Amino acid sequence: MSTALSVFVTGTDTEIGKTFVSAAMLHGFARHGLRAAALKPVAAGAYERDGIWRNEDADQLDAAANVALPPELRTPFLLKAPAAPHIVAAHEGVTLDIDTIVASHREALTRANVVVVEGVGGFRVPLNDTQDTADLAVALGLPVVLVVGIRLGCISHALLTADAIRQRGLTLAGWVANHVDPAMSYADENVATIRDWLAREHRAPLLGRVAHLRPAAPESAAAMLDIAALVDTLRRAQH
């Protein structure tokens, strides 16, 4: 059995900075002295460069990790169109298979001390006719970090997602407040409300508040996260 740590990163929605926070976590783990690798099992939206199909989110994770995984291991399912994965997969003749992703994760654990698995979109994004990303998280059996995009509506989105994580029998290891809307009114009060509710109902700590950075710099955001607390939680989850 592998002693490597691993965490599943999900979000309250798409386009709320899940990849950015995952990259910040990778930088943080590396600074903590860990060999950190990233898995982006399903990526929708690809571009071609030098005859190779790539994905911007996967590129960002590669740049942050200090352990490089082969592209086919890091992203076993790379879809060309930037749309809902199960729809794109059907059009491209691809079957998004959870067992393949689990096997990729198992191999990644042999190459690093910690593996950050970034989901796609929110917590319940269909992968095929019968399975979604919540099923993937269950199959991997990992603690979950929830990235909350701090914008209007984030309180309900955060609480609903946390409930869904618990309903699947998974541990919410903590959450990150990512300030995606610099003009949002009462941002501090929104964060405080989510913090209090998730602590009371799920014992899930706030792992950090990531400021709205321009330009985006995950290496700077890493300093805004409590990586030591997250490492402790992941180690406890192994026992």
UniProtKB/Swiss-Prot annotation:
Its EC number is 6.3.3.3. ATP binds at residues 15-20, 57, 118-121, 178-179, 211-213. Keywords: ATP-binding, Biotin biosynthesis, Cytoplasm, Ligase, Magnesium, Metal-binding, Nucleotide-binding. One of its GO terms (molecular function) is ATP binding. GO terms for biological process: biotin biosynthetic process. It comes from the Bacteria. Gene3D superfamilies: P-loop containing nucleotide triphosphate hydrolases. It is found in: Cytoplasm. Pathway: Cofactor biosynthesis; biotin biosynthesis; biotin from 7,8-diaminononanoate: step 1/2. The active site is at residue 40. The keyword S-adenosyl-L-methionine does not apply. HAMAP family: BioD (MF_00336). Belongs to the dethiobiotin synthetase family. This is ATP-dependent dethiobiotin synthetase BioD. It comes from Burkholderia vietnamiensis (strain G4 / LMG 22486).
